[in-house]
């Protein structure tokens, strides 16, 4: 079943939307971003979150101690790393967190070498999932689906053929996913899950951006329909 992660949660209304629609994962951003929250803010928001929804903490080039400081206040189900964290860093982090905490590594679609490396079985002890994103995470920019298929050396014209999950490491797909394009992107590359943020947002009168319940619902319904079929 295709999993859904809604990332960049910042307010109580968005928590309410999550509780109604029940994606498998939600994300708090703890690195510099327009969606960044403090650990105290995230803790307060999470108190009202449905316990079935897993919490992902997004970090970028933080120290291990900084990540552990967050976990000590807000128990995370998943640590998502978006920076230049290498294998040694990830292995050290893995050794210092509870076994129940998964580690995901986000990689740019242009970082072909590392995507292939982390998809290899040798890294399964430290990486539980990889997340393939565009070159500007959180920007809403898409990238050609063929880029993933070229990376994996398979035929992009065959439905469900471009499938990293048949390798040794499952992956989440990010990068400009919206309710309008989610079905096509899932069918073409068969990810384990999708990661969405800007694609389900609206711009408010004051210029801020927040999650739209209708867009969130539309996207999740389309993913669920694919799962049923």
From Swiss-Prot:
Any Gene Ontology biological process: L-tryptophan biosynthetic process
EC numbers: 5.3.1.24
Enzyme kind, highest EC tier: isomerase
InterPro entries for this protein: Aldolase_TIM (IPR013785), PRAI_dom (IPR001240), RibuloseP-bd_barrel (IPR011060), TrpF_fam (IPR044643)
Top-level taxon in the UniProt lineage: Bacteria
Example of a GO MF term: phosphoribosylanthranilate isomerase activity
N-terminal signal peptide: none
UniProt key word Membrane: no
Stored CDD domains: PRAI (cd00405)
Assigned keywords, A-Z: Amino-acid biosynthesis, Aromatic amino acid biosynthesis, Isomerase, Tryptophan biosynthesis
Catalysed reactions listed for this entry: N-(5-phospho-beta-D-ribosyl)anthranilate = 1-(2-carboxyphenylamino)-1-deoxy-D-ribulose 5-phosphate
Pathway field: Amino-acid biosynthesis; L-tryptophan biosynthesis; L-tryptophan from chorismate: step 3/5
Family indicated by similarity: Belongs to the TrpF family.
HAMAP family from the UniProt entry: PRAI (MF_00135)
The protein, known as: N-(5'-phosphoribosyl)anthranilate isomerase
Gene (name only): trpF
């Amino acid at each position: 079943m295709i999993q859904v992660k809604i990332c960049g949660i910042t307010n109580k209304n968005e928590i309410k939307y999550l509780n109604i629609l029940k994606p498998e994962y939600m994300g708090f951003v703890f690195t510099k971003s327009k969606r960044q929250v403090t650990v105290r803010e995230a803790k307060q928001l999470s108190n009202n979150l449905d316990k079935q929804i897993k919490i992902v903490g997004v970090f970028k080039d933080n120290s291990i101690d900084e990540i552990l400081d967050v976990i000590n206040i807000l128990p995370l189900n998943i640590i998502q790393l978006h920076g230049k964290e290498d294998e040694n860093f990830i292995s050290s982090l893995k050794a210092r967190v509870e076994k129940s905490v998964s580690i995901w590594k986000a990689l740019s679609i242009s970082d072909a070498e590392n995507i292939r490396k982390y998809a290899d079985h040798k890294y399964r002890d430290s990486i539980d999932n990889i997340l393939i994103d565009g070159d500007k995470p959180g920007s809403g920019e898409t990238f050609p689906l063929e880029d993933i298929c070229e990376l994996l050396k398979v035929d992009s014209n065959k439905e469900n053929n471009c499938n990293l999950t048949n390798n040794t490491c499952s992956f989440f797909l990010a990068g400009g996913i919206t309710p309008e394009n989610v079905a096509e992107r899932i069918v073409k590359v068969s990810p384990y899950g999708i990661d969405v943020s800007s694609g389900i947002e609206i711009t408010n009168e004051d210029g801020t951006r927040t999650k739209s319940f209708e867009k969130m619902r539309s996207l999740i319904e389309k993913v669920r329909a694919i799962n049923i079929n």
